[in-house]
Amino acid sequence: MPTTLYIIGNGFDQYHGAQSSYSAFRQYLLRCAPEVVMAFDLYWGPGTLLNSFEHPRDIEQCLLNNPKNYHHSNWTVDHLGADFERYLAELNREKVMTLADWYLPKIDEDDERFSYAEYFLPIDRIKEQIHHTTFEMRYRFHKWVNMLHYERGFRKKMLPLDSNALYLNFNYTLFLESEYHIPREQICYIHGSRRDKYGSLVLGHSENPEWAFEKWIHQHQNQRRFRPNLKDKKGRWYANDRLTYLSYFLEDKTRGNWRLPIRYYAQEAIREAIEGYYDNSLKRTHSVIHQHQSFFDSLKEVRKIVILGHSLSEVDMPYFDKIANSIIKDQVEWEISYHTPTDINRIHHFCKRYGISAQPTLL
C-alpha cells in the first residue's frame, strides 16, 4: 500500500504556468459570455448596482447592448475574480425581489387593461436569467478547463513527485497523468475531471441552505428598510410595502401592505425560485465523500502527506476532516506548500485546527 498522499490544489497548476485562477476564468467569461458577468452583477453579492438604474429598461440595455463596454461593479471584480464558488452563495434576495417588483404590472387583476402575460413575464424572466446564469457559468467553466495548458518551458520547474503515491486532486485538469505520468488509478479527482461530461464537474458553494437562510434573516431583520413602518419623503408613516420585507420579514402575510394581490402571488413564485437556487447550487461534499469512500479507506497506511498549491479554504474542510479521520495522525508527517506570507498564516490555522505540525515549503 502507498505510504505517501499528495493533495493537489489549483496553485500546483499555476506553478507550472497554467492560467487557472478564478480571475483568469472571469476574463474568459468577459470575452466569451459577458452577459453572465452582467447578470452576476445584478443578482449576486451585497452591492447596490440596482441603484444605478432609474428604470428596468435601463437594465435591459445593460444586459443586451455593448457588453464589452459594460462597467462592472467592484464586488464582481473582487469576488468573481477571487473565489466565485464561495460567492455562488451570495444570490441577493433583495436585489431579485426589487427587480421583480419593478417589472410587475401596476394595475389590478380587475382592470380591463390587466394581462396575465404581463404578470407572468417578469417572474419567468428573472427565473430564467438566474437559471441561465448558473447553467451557462457551469458550461463555460468546463470549456475553460479544457483550454488550460502549462506554459512553455514548464518542464524545467517540474517537481520530484513520487509516482507510487496516492493523489487527491482538487483540480479538474489531467496534468498529473499527461505530464507527470502518474497512473490514473492512483488519482482521486474529487470534483471530477475535464474528461467528464459537460455539467458534471462538482462546482458550488458549501453553505447549508437552512443555516445560511437563518443567518441572512438575523443579519437583516433589524435594518430600517425591513421594519413594519417606514417614512415617505414628506415624513409621513406608511406600512412597509417592500416586496423583500413582505416576503421574508412579515409574519402574518394577510396583514401586509401588498397594494395589489398579484404582488403576493409573485413573491411566492420568486421566493421559491431563490430558495430553490440555494439548494441546487450547494456543493454536497458529504455525498462526494461517500462516492469516493474507497479512496479514503485506502489512507490507513499513509505516513506522509504533502499538500501542494491548495488554499486550505473553508469550503474544502469537510474533505480534510475525512482525511484526518482516515489516518493515524500521530504517525503522519505533514508538508504544506505556501506562496505568500498570508499562506503561512493559513497553514498555522490549519495545523491548529487538526492538532498537527507541518513543514511549510515554498512553491
Language-model segments: what does each one mean?
Residues 16, 30, 34, 177-184, ...:
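Hydrophobic/aromatic-lined pockets within catalytic cores
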